[in-house]
Each structure stands twice: as structure tokens, then as C-alpha cells.
Amino acid sequence: MGRARPAFADSDTGHFDARKRDMRNIRLTIAYDGSNYVGWQIQPNGPTVQVAVEKAIKRLTGEEASVLSAGRTDSGVHALGQVASFQTESAIPIDGFRKALNKFLPDDVIVRDAEEVPLDFHATFSAVQKRYRYVIHNCRTHNPFLRNYVWHFHQDIDSVAMHEAAQELVGKHDFRSFESHWPNKSSSVRTVKEVTVRRQNFCPLWLGDAGQQPSDENAGEFIWLEIVADGFLYNMVRA
């Protein structure tokens, strides 16, 4: 790929002069608070994260981009590292995408990283694994400030027993019975690589790692359930 012609920023507006060049493929790592969205994918019944990202790209480059994603989160679901990709003819420097898109995105969506990747990279089909995290606030009284981010359950939960039982899911299995509206995939076989259930004394939802596990496995009000697989069927994790 040839050297890109420079893109210049207006000192007053900060807008880029997106001079055209050969087609480029841009991979974005996006974090968002899904509280105000009906999901990632474009839908007619409310705002979606995909629309917010595509509008920001249009304002930046003047192009109508179709943004692909590694996963399609549902209504109210958040993401720490959603991977997305789109193609563009813009010559904007790669770091300019991250900075400028964040200016055009709403406050609850942010591009954490932007990288130019080969044209055959596809955010959906190039994904090799996905990680989902569910957080249960296991205490007598719920915290109203966490209502959009955790599920409150007041009765005692044996997280150690949950973790032990969940290990039966690890491995390559036919998860047909876990899927709703079957069949909507060519195969219902998936490989679950890891399932962990552990308690935490704190709830740093914005961190990629749950942090240190308490010395007492039954300590901590927050139960973190994480599952990693090569892919998931529709409603498979919820089941």
C-alpha cells in the first residue's frame, strides 16, 4: 500500500481535510454504556450504538460507512472492548480517527483504539473468541446507582458451587438446547474455553480484569460470572 497523502486539520474547527486515497480498512475498539441504547445493531425502534458510530464517521469523512462488529449486544448491554471495522477512502492519519471520532460521538460511546488492518479483516468473521461478563450484586439491599450495571439478588448464592457446576460447560458441545428460535445458525456446536464464577469486594465494571479474588471465596458482595467461547448462539449465555 502506497504512502498516504497528508490530511490537514483546520486550526479553528479541528476538522480534517479527508483527501482521498486507496481503500483502507479501519479496526476500532469501542467502549460504551448501553443504558440509553436498544442494542448495537441498527433497529427501527430506538437509538443504537452502530448508528452513533456511523454518524460520527459520516461527520468526519463525509462517507456513508457500514460498520461491522464482532458481536451484537442487546438493549441495555454495555461493552468494554467491542471490535468494529469499516472501510474508507479517507487519508486521515490513523490516530486522527480515534481523536476525531470521539469528538463526534456521544459521551456514552468512546473509541479506545483505532488501527489500520488488511482489507480482508472482517470484525464479525475474523473474531476468534468473545467474552461476556455478568455481575450479580448479592446483598440484602440493592444499590440504586448500580441498577443499570448489575443484577441484584438478595438471597445467598453459593458462588463456589456455581463455579464448579459451570465447568461442565467447558469444551466443545452441541448447545442446541440453550438456543432460542432454533435453528438460526448452520451449526449449534460451540467451544466454551473458560467459565469463571467468583466473588469480588468491589465492582469496577470499567476494568477489563475483575482484579484480585478475595482470600475468602465466599467474601464479597459482587459475583462475577465470565464466559469465553469461540461464539455464542442466540440467547445461549442467558439460558
Residue ranges: model-predicted function:
Residues 2-4, 8:
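Short linear segments in intrinsically disordered or otherwise low-structure-confidence regions
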Residues 14-239:
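Structured-RNA-binding interfaces characteristic of tRNA pseudouridine synthases
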